[in-house]
Amino acid sequence: MTSSPNNLLEKIRCPNCWHEFPPDQLHFYSTSPEFAFDHVLGAGQQRAFLPSQFTPQGDAIDPGGGICTETACPKCHLRVPRLLAQFPTIAVSIFGSPGSGKSFLIAAMTHTVMQQIVHYGVTAEDADPLLNAIVRDYEKTLFQQASPDATVQLRKTEDVGDWYNKIQQRGRTKTLPKPFLYRIDRFWGNKTATHEGRCLCLYDNAGESFEPGAENEDNPVTRHMAKADTLLFVYDPTQETAFRRACAEKSSDPQWRGQARGDQTALFTEASKRIRDFRSMRPTDKIDTPLIVLLPKFDAWKFLLTDEDLPKPYKEVPVESGASSIRFLDTDILLDISRKCRLLIKKYQPALLAKIEATFNIKKIIFLPVSATGCSPVKESPPEPEQEVVPSLDNLDLGDLDLLSEDPPSNPDGYGHFRAGDINPIWAEMPLLTALKLVAPQFLPRAKK
């Protein structure tokens, strides 16, 4: 996708519905109150329209005379920041099974990248604060608790709800995933940015979205994976029986208790099948998209990989003035850690490794250990036991049926909360930095030897 002489891209790809259109078809949201209805978004939503009048500053004027600054896709009418008319998009899709810790990991990844990327000579900021509001709330929950003794727990990614938008098209309701958008620019050595930036577009996938029948024309919630420039597969060792047996005798971490959950190989197989289907590929074709396999909860199983802390994945090089330094990713360290993680999967889950390497280009697969929290979950003190009331079947009131049908607690052992003061992510910035290195290496050049 190239830029035209007026610094606009030839095509914009909507991050919501993936419709491609020229910049002059970008719609604007009306601001006049009489237009508080949109036939795609529904009642209470300001109408998206193609403007014919503009202010000298380039803002649209709606038919009621309102000045309009917010822009939308001409097809789905969802938000499309004007930035996407100038900056090419780097799309990153993350997927994994329920309980793999994706919610924590996404919050930790975005938070640590925003904190660390400046040391690499790159700036990062929200491309649209409204679109990123969910992730920002997760970050606040994880990293901005008032007390170090506060307990932290995040809601999982649901296959409906706040993580998705609903629109009306052709008399049918369609569900679309919400993207998270970040503007990234190089700046080191310049007083201002080079304006050769990118828009990083991050998608999350609920594990339930890979169940049979979850993906269809009215619910195309995983279709963005076929458009992704990089895929992040969260492979959770704590869900695998072989890993659990290897760790249970050596670790008191509560994440090794209970039964193994899910079938991560089946989920990976289904995700790969969908990508091939969406791209009209043959079942035997290899997917050429870079794949980063993330092994989360590293703090719980690190003794399987190393007896020491992970090394710093970068080199610091002084700048010419000598007053400061800039970081360069140390690809030798990344590849060495990737090799060790690969061997670990080969030892404990060889069938999955064979599936991964048979599906993707082996030269574009990287394995990374990460920990969103850097610590184990804690167990809360149990509440005082209450007198159990068992309704009599002889005079059972219909309202008492709720007592009999109540679902068991999802976390019967009381684990799953984290102490805020113990949270210290490990390599959480590396998935997105590695994705950026693979797709746009000019942002993270190699250090000169």
Regions found by a protein language model. Name each.
Residues 174-231, 239-246:
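Switch II of P-loop NTPase G domains
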Residues 92-94:
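Hydrophobic anchor at the beta1->P-loop junction of P-loop NTPases
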Residues 85, 113-160, 445-448:
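Flexible phosphate/Mg2+-sensing switch loops adjacent to catalytic phosphate-binding sites
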Residues 102:
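Conserved lysine of the Walker
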